Amino acid sequence: WNKGYKNLIPVNQYNVDYSILGGSRIEPLLRDIRLGMSAAGMTVESVKGECNFGQHEIAFKYSDALSNCDNHVIYKNGAKEIASQQGYALTFMAKPNEKEGNSSHIHLSFRGLKGELVMTDEADKEHGMSEIGRQFIAGQIAHLRELSLLFAPNINSYKRYVPGSFAPTAIRWGRDNRTCALRLVGHGAGLRLENRVPGGDVNPYLAVAGIIAAGLDGVKKKLKLEPAFTGNAYESDSSRVPASMSEALELWENSAWIKETFGAQVQAHYANMARVEIAAYGKAVTDWELFRNFERF
């Protein structure tokens, strides 16, 4: 805060994606975060370095949707507190600099009322996926653009969507295809859908609510799923993730499905939230403007 978040020194000065040494250098902090989350009842599956300098990823064992959202909030606050105690500043903002952004990929599968597998079907030799699973994904594709405000709730969120940056720009689904917004991974009981659109700044409750609502609409309407995309989705002519909060606001505010699904009050509330954010950003004088214009004019 006192430095205005400028000239901060990252804990790693290079790309430490899957680097054992890179993780070891910050292990005292990572260990305390793992132990703290375990003490809070979470099961930490892995921690690893990532591409941006000082960027690290943590993964937790799956649970029911509401419990995972609760754990998400506890983790983010707890990790910040633990980092502060060790003299570090930690951020989950979607795009803290021009390198790779911070994501919050949501992995989701679902069961029947008696706990039975309903997303999988071993008779499907292509993907091992049931017709209900296909309809659920089709619902995601149908409604992803109008739900973007729930996945990307800040001005900064949209700066993460850059081609080739591990953040999606194309609304397609693919089998283990990281260039798509939706990625199908696993098999059998572990078959699941990854939504790669949410960033680290996401409100998990809103994002998960949107994912479930879109999927159920796909099942209700028996939507047909397009074939899996197999190429580089960044280079495709696919429908795109909104490039700005203004675009996402327009899609959200004008959606009859959003109004029907969440209610007019919820639709109006989050539309107002976006307008407030956009207005505040419009009044700010940024470093980019100073650098570009101070000597120029």
Regions found by a protein language model. Give the residues of each.
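Glycine-rich, acidic/polar active-site loops that bind/position phosphate-bearing ligands
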Residues: 1-297
